[in-house]
A protein has these predicted regions:
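Conserved glycine-rich cofactor-binding loop
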Residues: 8, 15-17
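Conserved mid-core segment of classical short-chain dehydrogenase/reductases
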Residues: 70, 93-111, 134, 154-157, ...
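Catalytic Tyr-X3-Lys loop
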Residues: 92, 103-122, 137, 141, ...
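Residue(s) in the substrate-gating loop at a strand-loop-helix junction
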Residues: 145
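Short, small/polar-rich loop/turn modules that mediate ligand/substrate recognition or access, typified
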Residues: 177, 182, 238-240
Length: 253
């Protein structure tokens, strides 16, 4: 029996990068997965093909819009026939250094980042929790970032959005435990995906890899491994925890 046999899982931003690895790892363990994406339908179709099996679906929604986020949860529930696990993985990073960004760009970056990285997760947690509370419980895993702790000098809204996501997750861990809903967080450092490609392939690439004593950044599967652990049977008492997946590049205690 595979660990997530017949579990119904929604992964936001599940069409590429870390989300795709998370979707694949759940599918490999027997789950039925709904992958959400914003606009790249071709990547979502490729991902769905790679997942193989039956019953996986791709759902387009711009989750920065709360109405679309709510509809996404409804569509996932009806398309999968229920919802046991939600992974809030979709996120964006926008460059807006305070020394050079003009005020309107600064505000636009803050709004877009908070709407995508924090408000979307809050919307989806709300809608998913309503379903889970009526159906005996569930799991929520949120994908945060090392930047929440270490700071993001060129993308302060990103760091703030992920710190907010950590606080949201921990508040919900307390609020939802009596309803048998457990909430965990995974906080990666740099990961080999499109989001980080420009840095990793650029002149700072070697310095970034050297931040870890392993001399490299994370692979998406390594983040997925931590996500599946938090969603697995037996991990209930870890609720409220934040797992670092940063290769000891930033240590906190
Ligand atoms: P990625 O390769 O850029 O992929 C982003 C995914 O999110 C895509 O599927 C994208 O869909 C989707 N997405 C973005 N905005 C969306 C929206 N408004 N509505 C719905 N879907 C949306 O990103 P990644 O590197 O895998 O990152 C995944 C998560 O890990 C993010 O939360 C990120 O902050 C976090 N993280 C990443 C790193 C890193 O180094 N890569 C480090 C720490 C944390 P489309 O393709 O359709 O746009």
């Amino acid at each position: 029996m595979r660990q997530f046999q017949d579990k119904k899982v929604l992964v936001t931003g599940g069409s590429r990068g870390i989300g795709k690895s998370i979707a694949r790892a759940f599918a490999d363990q027997g789950a039925r997965v709904a992958i959400n994406y914003r606009s790249n339908a071709a990547a979502a179709a490729d991902c769905l093909r790679e997942l193989g099996g039956k019953g996986n679906i791709a759902l387009q929604a711009d989750i920065a819009d709360p109405a679309q986020a709510a509809m996404l949860v409804e569509d996932a529930i009806s398309g999968l026939g229920g919802l046991d696990i939600v992974v809030n993985n979709a996120g964006i990073y926008l460059w807006h250094p305070i020394a050079t960004a003009d005020f309107s760009d600064w505000i636009a970056a803050w709004r877009q980042t908070i709407d995508t990285n924090l408000l979307a997760a809050a919307s989806i947690c709300y809608c998913a929790a309503q379903h889970m509370m009526r159906h005996g419980g569930g799991r929520i895993v949120n994908v945060s970032s090392r930047g929440a702790f270490r700071g993001e000098p060129d993308g302060p809204a990103y760091g703030a959005s992920k710190a907010g996501l950590n606080a949201l997750s921990q508040s919900l861990a307390i609020a939802l435990a009596p309803h048998n809903i457990f909430v965990g967080v995974v906080a990666p450092g740099f990961v080999e995906t499109d989001m980080a490609a420009e840095w990793l392939e650029g002149e700072r690439g070697d310095a970034i890899r050297a931040q870890s004593p392993l001399g490299r950044v994370a692979r998406p599967e390594e983040v997925a491994h931590a996500v599946l652990f938090l969603a697995s049977p037996g991990a209930e008492f870890t609720t409220g925890t934040i797992i670092d997946v940063n290769g000891a590049s930033y240590l906190r205690s």
